[in-house]
Regions:
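Bacterial N-terminal signal peptides
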Residues: 2-13
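Structured soluble/peripheral alpha/beta segments that form catalytic or ligand/cofactor-binding pockets
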Residues: 16-343
């Protein structure tokens, strides 16, 4: 689950008559082809987050995300500039040691080479922000006014498919789901500015046409990379009345790399402390696996603010402590106003 306010805001303008596919059980995943664009689904994203440090112990969290929103029409116009897909990207950097958080966003239509996610090119890009693939190794580049990074991500485990029977179900009803693939542990090396850094990253890729139900107004999503080589993805969907949706779920990847689906009743997320309206400290329990940990933001203010659309959300680097230790990322949406995906 990821949120892009601007993408959601502009999508109704481009609504067309093209019949997009639904995310349905039994999807026949084919890698590496499925790591790239799926233009027969309406919405898609590639999401990178990581925690790294330099030789002196200076800590950073980084995020680079590419989004595609389909706006296809049944049209005979073959011009390369006809809007078929809109690509949005954002890059963010948390300087945990210096207590700074920066966020940048860019929007482009696909056009002739401006943005895309090409299997033929083995590349996902928006302008000069990019993820270049060589096998499963992914090299990230982003340049902004305040920071730049060049990072190579090497997976330590094969990609996993989240959910059950090929879909991550988000609500009751046919097609209210996504196809969801993760690289839960990537070893990182490279540079942030002039600092050489190493660490761990997580990569998500989702594609779908419709997900949320009307009563679902937001979510809390965790990636967890524990020092014992256990990884977790957990999300809770929230209703208007504050209730947790029964389609909330997760995945535990054991130290051998095997993925185990977690249903709503198999984990507990309990908010402990807030920064403004956002819970920035949580207790996380997975009783069946003996996990009882606390998530704490490395910097409280990691809110991504979008004044134009008034759809702010929080996403940033966290530490985990308790009976296990580790690092990860947390995303929280719908605390200011409900989140909506367009149909």
């Amino acid at each position: 689950l990821k949120l892009i306010p601007l993408l959601l805001a502009i999508a109704p303008v481009f609504a067309g008559s093209f019949a997009y596919r639904e995310a349905l059980p039994g999807y026949p995943y084919q890698f590496p082809r499925d790591h790239f664009e799926h233009q027969d689904f309406r919405t898609e994203w590639w999401y990178y987050t990581g925690n790294v440090s330099d030789a002196a112990g200076k800590r950073f969290g980084f995020e680079l995300v590419f989004f595609r929103q389909g706006e296809r029409h049944d049209s005979d116009n073959s011009s390369a500039w006809v809007a078929q897909d809109v690509y949005l990207a954002h890059a963010a950097l948390t300087d945990a040691s210096g207590k700074h958080f920066w966020y940048y966003e860019r929007l482009n239509r696909a056009g002739p080479g401006v943005a895309g996610a090409s299997f033929a090119k083995q590349r996902i890009w928006n302008g000069n922000w990019a993820s270049q693939w060589s096998g499963d190794t992914q090299t990230l580049d982003a340049i902004t006014d305040r920071f730049r990074f060049h990072l190579t991500l090497q997976p330590e485990t094969p990609p996993i498919v989240q959910g059950e029977n090929g879909v991550s179900q988000k609500a009751a009803g046919k097609g209210r789901a996504s196809h969801y693939v993760s690289f839960p542990l990537l070893r990182v090396s490279g540079t942030i500015g002039s600092d050489a850094v190493t660490g761990r990253a997580w990569m998500d890729h989702e594609w779908f046409t419709e997900q949320l139900a009307p009563e679902q107004v937001g979510w809390d999503w965790f990636s967890v990379q524990l020092d014992d080589r256990t990884e977790l993805m957990l999300f809770e969907l929230r209703h208007k009345d504050g209730a947790v949706d029964p389609y909330s779920s997760g995945t535990l990847i054991d130290s051998g790399g095997k993925a185990h689906h977690l249903r709503r009743g198999e984990f507990v997320l309990q908010p402990l402390a807030k920064w403004h309206k956002y819970p920035v400290e949580w207790r996380i329990q997975v009783p069946g696996w003996g996990i009882d940990i606390t998530s704490k933001a490395v910097l409280e203010d990691q809110e991504l603010r979008d004044p134009a659309n008034k759809t702010n959300y929080w996403e940033g680097a966290v530490d985990y402590s308790g009976n296990r230790r580790g690092v990860g990322y947390l995303e929280m949406t719908g605390y200011g106003q409900p989140v909506r995906f367009v149909k």
